[in-house]
């Protein structure tokens, strides 16, 4: 995953990015600085020599795989990532990929460490998280009296070498091994490099799947759920079906599906003047060709769920504005079971995993998909499984209603 160091200021419904620093690091989120000075924190962690004692060994274990991947321009290839994870495991290291698409190696070591945390015993472990940007994170964890201290170091591959680029330390403010088989922990880490640039620490939320998952489940997730995901849409948030599309927002779906259909970004963008909301008229054929490729829906039904002008046969389209911005941390759906139905559809049972909130099951839902002969797919329905343990979808900001839009821009 990518570490985004972004200072966000929320004012009058606007999100203004004041500074962006990109690191090839996994599992971190954005946090504004609360003070101009770093508080003096003393953490009982391993000596620097102990932290570095396995560094050279780890690099030597996998450097040839990185060389091969770079030569073939496949540093982000899943099978390459899998080979690196497995090589580390063969040499006794717990390892997993940053997208939790490969079963963790040496998971028993991690489970034993978690038991020692609960028992308030003293223990150490190194866990490696292989990223998709040509590098990996090394977590050196130390526990004592039930507290967990974290030393996280990022190693990047470049020009035939793997080098440590940044190291941070923190004590885990949140630590949990979940019923769904995830190790989730978080805290605010500091490093000299980071402080020079931001005068603050970085908030990190880490989610590592410890328990194995059937590869078929992961393939189904990658094929049907992850391409939609949760950013700026409610497809997996609300109940809907082909018989009743409910509150499914087809404008959000248009934004997500347009690039998949046309191979380029949606050309209908927000106005440069932030006080003005752009309004477009999209020809009927253009709008429907995007939606109907992924949904079995007729024109009449689609028109009833949108704003359609029958006089010129166009769909009104308003791109999301700053009032509809979302904080850039999202969950993902993970298939944990499936049923092949007699009508050719597939029912996917999935959990919503949200690393930012430290929750490996925000809620469970069922998604029905219809695979097509040409390799495509139609989405048939989504149903949230009722439970007292379900959490709210705090990441989502819906599009403005007609009334809200009129109140903001109607007088222009």
For each feature predicted by the language model, list its residue ranges.
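Bacterial N-terminal signal peptides that target proteins for export
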Residues: 2-14
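C-terminal motif of bacterial Sec signal peptides marking the signal peptidase cleavage site
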Residues: 24-27
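Bacterial signal peptide processing site
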Residues: 29-31
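Mature, Sec-exported extracytoplasmic domains of Gram-positive
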Residues: 34-412
């Amino acid at each position: 995953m990518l570490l985004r160091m972004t200072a966000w200021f929320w004012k009058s419904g606007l999100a203004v990015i004041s500074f962006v620093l990109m690191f090839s690091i996994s599992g971190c989120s954005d946090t504004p600085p609360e003070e101009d000075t770093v508080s003096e924190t003393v953490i009982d962690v391993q000596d620097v020599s102990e932290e570095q004692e396995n560094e050279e060994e780890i690099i030597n274990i996998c450097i040839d795989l990185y060389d091969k991947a770079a030569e073939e321009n496949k540093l982000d290839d899943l099978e390459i990532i899998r080979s690196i994870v497995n090589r580390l495991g063969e040499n006794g290291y717990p390892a997993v990929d940053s997208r939790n698409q490969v079963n963790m190696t040496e998971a028993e070591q991690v489970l034993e460490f978690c038991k020692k945390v609960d028992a308030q015993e003293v223990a150490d472990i190194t866990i490696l998280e292989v990223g998709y940007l040509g590098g990996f994170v090394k977590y050196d964890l130390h526990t004592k009296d039930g507290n967990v201290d974290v030393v996280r170091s990022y190693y990047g591959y470049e020009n035939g070498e793997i080098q440590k680029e940044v190291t941070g330390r923190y004590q885990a403010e949140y630590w949990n091994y979940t019923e769904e088989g995830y190790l989730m922990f978080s805290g605010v880490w500091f490093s000299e490099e980071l402080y020079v640039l931001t005068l603050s620490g970085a908030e990190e939320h880490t989610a590592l799947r410890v328990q194995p998952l059937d590869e078929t489940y992961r393939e189904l997730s990658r094929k049907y759920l992850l391409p939609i995901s949760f950013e700026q849409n409610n497809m997996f948030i609300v109940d809907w079906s082909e018989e009743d599309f409910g509150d499914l927002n087809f404008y959000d779906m248009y934004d997500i599906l347009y690039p998949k259909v046309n191979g380029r970004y949606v050309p209908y963008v927000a106005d440069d003047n932030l006080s003005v909301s752009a309004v477009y008229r999209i020809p009927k054929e253009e709008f429907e060709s995007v939606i109907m490729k992924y949904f079995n829906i007729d024109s009449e039904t689609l028109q009833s769920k949108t704003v359609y002008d029958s006089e010129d046969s166009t769909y009104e389209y308003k791109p999301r504005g700053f009032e509809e911005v979302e904080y850039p941390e999202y969950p993902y759906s993970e298939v944990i079971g499936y049923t092949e139905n007699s009508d050719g559809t597939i029912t996917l049972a999935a959990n919503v995993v949200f690393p930012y909130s430290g929750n490996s099951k925000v809620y469970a839902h069922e998604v029905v998909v219809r695979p097509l002969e040409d390799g495509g797919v139609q989405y048939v329905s989504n149903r949230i499984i009722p439970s007292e343990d379900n959490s709210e979808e705090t990441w989502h900001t819906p599009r403005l209603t007609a009334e809200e839009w009129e109140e903001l821009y109607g007088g222009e």
